[in-house]
A protein has these predicted regions:
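Conserved glycine-rich Rossmann-like NAD(P)H-binding loop of the short-chain dehydrogenase/reductase
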Residues: 31-48
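Aromatic pocket-lining residues of Rossmann-like dinucleotide-binding sites
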Residues: 28
Length: 98
């Protein structure tokens, strides 16, 4: 895959505090994307963002409950205000059962 095509693009990744969402956020940032990491856990989400930044990436954290439509609107608004645009969304948020 040619990751040069994503360089400079802006994406929201939900569920970015761990698991698949975290891996996607890290991969995007490592390949030059600007990433908005969204998750419910401030501590875990901010830790991911701090690590991305410490490794030369560009990311912000927005605490978000993806079951709340107003929170989703706020997430998109914050992304656009911070980066000036939004190129994509990875909808990865979920709830563990069991």
């Amino acid at each position: 895959m040619d990751f040069k095509s994503v360089e400079g693009k802006v994406a929201i990744v939900t569920g970015a505090s761990r698991g698949i969402g975290e891996a996607i956020a890290r991969c995007y940032a490592a390949n030059g994307m600007k990433v908005i990491c969204a998750a419910r856990s401030v501590e875990q989400g901010q830790a991911v963002v701090n690590d991305i930044i410490n490794n030369g990436g560009d990311a912000i954290f927005v605490q978000t409950d993806c079951s709340d439509g107003n929170a989703i609107k706020d997430l998109v608004d914050k992304a656009v205000v911070h980066y000036g645009r939004l190129d994509g969304v990875v909808s990865n948020a979920g709830i563990g059962m069991g």
